[in-house]
Amino acid sequence: MSVLFALFQFLKPYQVRVWVFLAALIFTAGVTLSIGQGLRLVIDQGFAEQSQSQLNLAIIFVLVASALMAAGTYIRFYLISWLGERVSADIRTSVFDHIVDLHPAFFETNRSGDIMSRLTSDTTLLQSIIGSSVSIALRSTISFTGALIMLLITNIKLTFIIVVAVPVVLIPVLVFGRKVRKLSRESQDSIADVGSYAGEIIQHIKTVQSFTQEAQEKRAFSVEVERAFAVAKRRVSQRANLMAAVILLVFGALSAMLWVGGTDVINGDMSGGELGAFIFYAILMATGVASLSEVYGELQRAVGATERLMELLYAENHILTINSAQDVSRLAAVLDFKNLTFCYPSRPQQPALMDFSLTIAKDKIIALVGPSGAGKSTLFDLIQRFYDPQQGEICFGDCNIRQLDPRELREQIAVVQQQPTLFTGDVMYNIRYGKSSATDEEVMAAAVAAHADEFISKLPNGYHSDLGEQGVRLSGGQRQRIAIARALLKDPRILLLDEATSALDAESEYKVQLALDKLMKGRTTVIIAHRLATILHADQIVVMDGGRKVAQGSHQQLLKSSPLYARLAKLQFSADAVISSET
């Protein structure tokens, strides 16, 4: 019930339309029931009495009722279809709005393909069910109730047969309905698995083809599809059992009723018109039960889809936005890490940082070096408050960042990653992502400062050239300069660089380095360094290993005081020397 209550909350803004729909539904059901009386008049007064005038009146009555029923059906169908589309759109928007605010830890334990399936497939299913199945269920319920009342008015003895049959019919509905609901949830989960798998393969299609794994991936995908089909087959089987059982029981009861009623007509205990009207109401009642049995499975699917969507909508955000009175822009651009210990939620027994302390002064350049898994990228995540440490604190200026609004904090920070993220869209859109209110002139100025204008102007449509998915139409160096232009446009006070030149050729590296030098000027900068030659200019170099800070100093100081740094320097500079001698 809580799931359905959550769904009904999305209908509250449209109460007027809901009430008009219900009025049209009740009106249409009432008109439909009146047709049974028209049928009785046609038989008793038109046929039995052989009166043309009475027949004409009865036919006119039926035609008027049919016209009213058509008008009511139009209003009912339009409104419920509109509500289905509107509510599914509102749910989709609400879920997406909540998802983009969730902490990154949520996405460690929830696959993107599954989330996409819920946003698309489940909301589409809800739209179909609200716009169709709910209407059928309500109409069938009202028709069933109204037909039962008319049956009692027409003939109590025959109604007794129908009333006895109803509980018998409801038994398979309840038994199979529970199974259908469970299997519907499993089916939707398995379909989401298929979507997740396909999305991952398509995203990494070059790697798949490079390793000639097409045949293996086809087989693996086929296994996922067949697994989803197996669950769907069980669900369909249960629904088929439900429908077959209901039809058999309903029409069995109708047959018994016809036999008793026909006998009464032969004996003169009731008129042919009364029997005709009774048959009409009985069929209406039987149709209502049959429709309910069919729709019941759809409604169970709706419950499953709603559960999956509500899980996303009510997922708790561990990094809360607070109404802080502190103006972040007035705080000094100083970062102070105090005794940090942090484990990722997906690896709670494996600390990524242990008792880590470091102070980064305003406008200074700090480089982080160390082997893979040392905790360098984790620091970037914590600075942006994607996670909160289990122990210790991080201060921006003299304020603990837990006391700051995460959005306001992130407004002060820009990141340039080793593999920059670009979105499907044109150059202008991707650079303006750093500052949505920026004018075209400001975007172009940032591109010029990032040494990106020289290649952007050569693109087919200049700044309005589409970059493709993830910027696939640009080289690595070009993508980096777009990312730097975006960071320049944001004009942050703290800059995080994840070795932005490590994967570039010499010419691209030179141009990117020029852009980075301009970007770092006058900003507190933290660099993750994979190549020590790129950070010799840093004010301080911090050596990390196993989540701990093991040394800190200048390049020359660390060569003497840190065996780990000296070993890394020897390996890298010796390799560079060998490469230089060979060329």
Spans of features found by a protein language model:
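Membrane-integrated ABC transporters
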Residues: M1-V31, I35, F47-F61, R76-I80, ...
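Transmembrane helices of ABC transporter permease
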Residues: P13, R17-T28, S135-E186, M257-M270
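Alpha-helical segments in transporter systems
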Residues: V16-Q37, A58, V62, I80-S81, ...
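Helix-loop-helix
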Residues: S51, M150-V164, Q238-E307, L312-L313
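ABC-type nucleotide-binding domain
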Residues: I322, S329-T583
